[in-house]
Design a protein with these regions (language model features):
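Ligand-binding clefts of soluble mixed alpha/beta catalytic domains
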Residues: 1-224
C-alpha cells in the first residue's frame, strides 16, 4: 500500500530536462519520481544499459516500464537494447502487466556491425512485441522521438492506448541539424557564411518543428 497520491505534483520534473537538446540526463531519476514510494525493480540492469526495463507500482498497480536512457549511447536503440525491450514487453503481456513507455530516442545505432548483426530484425521484434500486446499501454515522449526508432517505441501507430508528450518533446524524422542539411543544402552551399546561416536555420527549424504541437494537431498524441 502506498501513500503517494497518483495526482501529486512533482515540481522537480518541470526543470529536469536540460535546455541543451544534446545534453544527457538520467532517465532513472524520472522513473523514481513518478512511481510509488520512489522504488522500482530493474530487470537486466547491467545489459544493454541504453534502455531501462523495470517493474514498479503506480497508484498501487504493478507496471512494466520501458525507457530510453540518454546517459548511455544517448539512448539510441541497438540490437541488444531492442531485443531486451522486446522480451520485456512480451513478458508483461503474458502476465497481464500494464506497460509505461518513456521515450527519448534519437534513432537506431548506425554502423556496419549493427547492419550485419540484423538491427532491422531486432527492431522488428520490438515493433511486433508492442503491436501484439493486449495489456493497457501508455507512452510518454520526454524529449527526442526520431524516425523509425520512435515508431517501435510504442507510438500511436502500434496501438498505444494513450500517448502524451512533455513540452520538450520532439517528434520528427530526424534532428534539426540533419534536417537543415538536407532541406537547405543548396542555400547552405551558396551562403557566404555557411556556419552562421546554418545556425540561423537550425534555430528557425527548432522553433517551428521541435515541439509536440504539430503532432497534437494531427492527432498523433493525446495531450501535452
Amino acid at each position: 500500500i502506498t501513500e503517494d497520491e497518483p495526482s501529486r505534483v512533482i515540481e522537480s520534473l518541470d526543470s529536469f530536462i536540460p535546455e541543451n537538446r544534446n545534453q544527457p540526463y538520467d532517465m532513472e531519476k524520472i522513473i523514481l519520481d513518478i512511481v510509488d514510494d520512489g522504488e522500482h525493480y530493474p530487470i537486466q540492469s547491467n545489459y544493454a544499459t541504453n534502455i531501462i526495463t523495470s517493474f514498479a507500482r503506480i497508484n498501487g498497480n504493478t507496471t512494466g516500464i520501458v525507457a530510453n536512457q540518454p546517459m548511455e549511447l544517448a539512448g539510441v536503440l541497438d540490437i541488444k537494447a531492442s531485443e531486451k525491450a522486446a522480451r520485456f514487453v512480451r513478458f508483461c503481456d503474458a502476465f497481464n502487466i500494464s506497460i509505461l513507455t518513456l521515450v527519448d530516442v534519437p534513432g537506431f545505432l548506425p554502423g556496419v556491425e549493427q547492419e550485419h548483426g540484423g538491427i532491422i530484425r531486432s527492431g522488428a521484434k520490438l515493433l511486433y512485441a508492442y503491436s501484439e500486446a493486449t495489456v493497457p499501454r501508455v507512452c510518454v515522449v520526454i524529449r527526442k522521438a526520431y524516425g523509425g526508432a520512435y515508431i517501435v517505441m510504442d507510438s500511436i501507430g502500434l496501438g498505444a492506448d494513450k500517448l502524451f508528450a512533455w513540452p520538450s518533446g520532439e517528434i520528427a524524422v530526424m534532428g534539426a541539424e540533419g534536417a537543415v542539411d538536407i532541406i537547405n543544402r543548396r542555400e547552405l552551399a551558396e551562403a557566404e557564411d555557411r556556419n552562421s546561416y546554418k545556425e540561423k536555420l537550425v534555430k528557425e527549424y527548432n522553433k517551428k518543428f521541435s515541439n509536440p504541437d504539430i503532432a497534437a494537431q494531427l492527432g498523433l498524441i493525446d495531450n501535452i
